[in-house]
Amino acid sequence: MRRVLNTLQSTWLAYRDVTERTVYTCVGHPQRADISAILNWLLNENDFAACFKHIQDLKIAKGLALNDILTEIHTIIHRVKFPPEVLITLLIKMSDSEARLASGCSERIELAALIAAFVDAREHINVAELTA
């Protein structure tokens, strides 16, 4: 409860307005709309370079850390209807990226790895749909 009050007080002092956007900005978490856009690009963008550029530009514009993006995406992808083997592989690749980030690996390299993991997941889903 104290943490919530501290967050609300900090948000009010910084922005003089307490909204979802200002709270997320104050605590440094990516906003839901940003994560939705990133997940949309990861699931639907066929051009790897374009996907990388979209996400990288958003990260720079909003000051987002890839580790925070990974955490938020992890929460959401459990709601996506992936086949179990695809979801397991995707979660393993995401956890590997998070571990490499924690050990000091480049965010650009790990962003590319994250995009590659989703491209791989999409290919496995398409192959599974074709063979079913």
PLM regions and their residue ranges:
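AAA+ P-loop NTPase domains with strong preference for DNA replication initiators
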Residues: M1-A132
